[in-house]
Every structure is written in structure tokens, then in C-alpha cells.
Amino acid sequence: MIIDRVEVETINSFSKLELFKEIYGLIWILPIFALLLGITIEVLVIVWLEREISASIQQRIGPEYAGPLGLLQAIADGTKLLLKEDILPSRGDIPLFSIGPSIAVISILLSFLVIPLGYRFVLADLSIGVFLWIAISSIAPIGLLMAGYSSNNKYSFLGGLRAAAQSISYEIPLTFCVLAISLLSNSLSTVDIVEAQSKYGFFGWNLWRQPIGFLVFLISSLAECERLPFDLPEAEEELVAGYQTEYSGIKYGLFYLVSYLNLLVSSLFVTVLYLGGWNFSIPYISFFGFFQMNKIIGILEMVIGIFITLTKAYLFLFISITIRWTLPRMRMDQLLNLGWKFLLPISLGNLLLTTSFQLVSL
């Protein structure tokens, strides 16, 4: 009986251990689901904001029938795309045609892994965080090129080639700007870069130490988002809809989602690299510095950090939306000349100057 009791207790302990493993596995997945839910809500808010801002710029009435103030218009559009027929080109490369949008969306979603939204609120604090973002974001144009090539349409293929050329042209200045920030912060981690700007509050932002790099990063990130005046890959007057021409239904909705996800990622990285991230702007003041032992206050501090990060990101969103609805589209030669003959030398010179100052200060 004693042996039987020991065996039963052992079995119960193993069953409890397995239960704990299952619970831990579910808890590990919860932050990912929370992040995906937050991203979905943010995209819906950005779509609504763009429609309201564009309506204000053009002096017209924006969406107002779908829900209060038109808040449900984006949900209605998404539902419509989900219910539409998924038409496949008869002579296209169907596997590549189906994979292209997924590659573009996944590459953008993976970028959120290294973005610190608030204090101690980041999925992966990696030592090469900013380089991982650059490497991952360079995968998205491959999906666009696959989509254009597999459509068996000259307009789609030309749009895919334009997307690849535009990404290559502006990825290099973007990388040089990130390298300059990493030299100032002595780290490639996004969390370390934010904490390096926290010493002097508003005056410690990299915006003041890297004004030229900030402007180059701003222009390059807008070009990476492929929005006006840099929307050459999908110019309606020239290419119908570019690489999206043959797409319909949910696949077309994925490309629509990529545009706003890319804009959100760029806004958050501008905030993290140049605007101090989650740090409050007033120097030498921490409202919760005396209450670090209280877990509730710690959670409140994290929530306020997320709010500050998103507020700064929405400033960049407002600028990008305003630029889209006020400036005309550039020609392809102007776009390439801006990237290779103007932004690239300036970003390289900025990196060399930053390196020189860092060596002198040692």
C-alpha cells in the first residue's frame, strides 16, 4: 500500500508538471496575441485618421455613415475584401502569386519583435535589434517582386521591379542613419538606444544630435513605405495598380495591410531612434521614481510609456499623411537621383562625422 501511495503521488506530481508546462506555454503565447490585437486596432485607427485628415485637407466630408464619425468604415472595407472572390490569373505562376502577399505581411509583422513599445515591454530585446529590423524589412520587396512577376502582366511586373529598385535605393541611406545612432548609443539594441536618450529628457533625444540623419531617415522611411510622393510602384496613371493589378479579395487586402503596417513600423522606429521612445520629455523628472517597489505602479508606468511612444509615433503618422495628400508624385528618375545622388552621400558623410566625433571623445 505504501508503494502504491508513492506511485500515485509520483504520477500526480508528473501530471501537475505537465499542467504547469501547458499553462506556461499558453502564457508565453499571450503577449504575441496581445501584440497582434494591438496592431490590428492601430491599423484600423490609422486608416480612419488618414481618411479624416485627407478629407480635411481637401475640404470635404470624410466617412460618416459606417458607425459614429465613420469609425467602422475600415472594418466594413476589410469585411468586403474578405467576402470578395479570389481571382487567379489563368497564365500566371499560381504558387508565387499566392506566396507573394504573405511574404510581405510576415516580414513587416516580424519587425514588431524588436520594437520597445514601453518600459520593459518588448518581445525580443536582442543585441542586434536595429540590424534585424533592416534585414527583415528588406525581405518585403522580394514578396512584391514575386507578386509582380507571377501575375503575367506587364504593368504588374514593372511595378514589382520599381518596388525592388526603390527599396534598394533607400535601404542604404536608412542603414547609414541607423549606424550613426548605434555609434552614439554604443549599442545595436533598441532598448539600449532608448535608454541612452533618457539622461536629459527632451534635450537628450537623438533628434538634436543627429538632425541631418533624422531628415534622411524620415525621407528614406517614407520611400520605404511607398507612399506619395514615392508611390511609383503602384502609380495609377502609369501602371493601373502596379504589382496589385491582378489581385482581388483577401490577397489584395494583404497588400493594403502591408502599406499601413509599414507606415506604423516606420513611425515607431522614428520614435525609438530619434524621439526618446517611451521616455517622458521633461528632464530629471520621473513621476514613479519613488514607487519602484509597487507592482501596480510599475504596470502603470509601462502603460504610460506605451501611451507616450504611440503619441510620438502618431506625430510622424500625421506628417506622412499630410505629405501624401499635399505633394505630387515624383518621376522614377527623380526618385532614383534623390536616393543615390543626394541622400546616400549625405548619410555617408553624417556617419563619417559621427564616427570622427566619437573617436575624438574617447
Swiss-Prot record:
Signal peptide: none
Keywords: Chloroplast, Membrane, NAD, NADP, Plastid, Plastoquinone, Quinone, Thylakoid, Translocase, Transmembrane, Transmembrane helix
One GO term (biological process): photosynthesis, light reaction
Membrane topology according to the record: Multi-pass membrane protein
Broad EC category: translocase
GO CC term, one of those recorded: chloroplast thylakoid membrane
E.C. no: 7.1.1.-
Domain of life: Eukaryota
Molecular-function GO terms, alphabetical: oxidoreductase activity, acting on NAD(P)H, quinone or similar compound as acceptor; quinone binding
Main subcellular localisation: plastid
Record field: transmembrane: 26-48, 97-119, 126-148, 163-185, 254-276, 296-318, 338-360
Cell compartments where the protein resides: Plastid, Chloroplast thylakoid membrane
Pfam families linked to this entry: NADHdh
Reaction equations catalysed: a plastoquinone + NADH + (n+1) H(+)(in) = a plastoquinol + NAD(+) + n H(+)(out); a plastoquinone + NADPH + (n+1) H(+)(in) = a plastoquinol + NADP(+) + n H(+)(out)
Subunit structure: NDH is composed of at least 16 different subunits, 5 of which are encoded in the nucleus.
NCBIfam families the UniProt entry points to: PRK06076.1-2
Family named by the database record: Belongs to the complex I subunit 1 family.
Role noted for this protein: NDH shuttles electrons from NAD(P)H:plastoquinone, via FMN and iron-sulfur (Fe-S) centers, to quinones in the photosynthetic chain and possibly in a chloroplast respiratory chain. The immediate electron acceptor for the enzyme in this species is believed to be plastoquinone. Couples the redox reaction to proton translocation, and thus conserves the redox energy in a proton gradient.
Protein name, as recorded: NAD(P)H-quinone oxidoreductase subunit 1, chloroplastic
Protein's organism: Zea mays
Organism lineage: Eukaryota, Viridiplantae, Streptophyta, Embryophyta, Tracheophyta
